[in-house]
């Protein structure tokens, strides 16, 4: 179960629904742990939770923008407007290529900052594509699968490759929940 301070990564975050739900859950845990019954937190603390815990990767720029916007809207949901206006030094977090990476999960140059202990939770719904000779736009996945010697990816299914690679980013006690084809 998700606990305060845990790190969550969605390697194919799309519009960010899994990340938004994880962020909401972490905020609710913080509210419960502090006995806060107002349903509101200081914007700086909300920013800290977001930057400490939430990570995502998505190839589509528009989807990355939706993810970042949704996370900021979630932050705003837990702030009273006067508190936000009173804090002149507060700045919204820069998420692009800091916590939300607009890149291919299989790109060897992906700059995803994996915590030293690994991620605590990896959740997502990777694409259910089977690589065939005519499949276009999957050069990084194709190369990663071809170079994979430890674990064979059944039928060149990209979702299975996501599961293998994501599993390697988990910490010793980490858990993954990915929607995969049967």
Model regions and ranges:
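SAM-dependent methyltransferase catalytic-core segment centered on the flexible catalytic loop
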Residues: 17-40, 105-182
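Conserved S-adenosyl-L-methionine
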Residues: 1-108, 180-182
């Amino acid at each position: 179960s998700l606990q305060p301070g845990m790190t969550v990564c969605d390697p194919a975050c799309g519009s960010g629904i899994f990340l938004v739900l994880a962020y909401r859950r972490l905020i609710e845990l913080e509210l419960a742990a502090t006995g806060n019954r107002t349903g509101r937190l200081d914007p700086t603390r909300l920013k800290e939770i977001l930057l400490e815990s939430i990570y995502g990767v998505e190839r589509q720029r528009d989807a990355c923008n939706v993810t970042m916007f949704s996370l900021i809207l979630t932050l705003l949901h837990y702030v009273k407007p006067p508190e936000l206006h009173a804090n002149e030094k507060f700045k919204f977090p820069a998420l692009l290529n800091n916590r939300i990476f607009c890149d291919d999960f299989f790109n060897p140059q992906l700059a995803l900052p994996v915590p030293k202990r690994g991620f605590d939770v990896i959740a997502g719904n990777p694409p259910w594509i089977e690589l065939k000779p005519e499949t276009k736009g999957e050069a990084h996945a194709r190369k990663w699968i071809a170079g994979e010697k430890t674990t064979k990816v059944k039928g060149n299914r990209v979702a299975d490759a996501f599961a293998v690679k994501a599993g390697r980013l988990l910490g010793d006690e980490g858990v993954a929940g990915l929607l995969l084809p049967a």
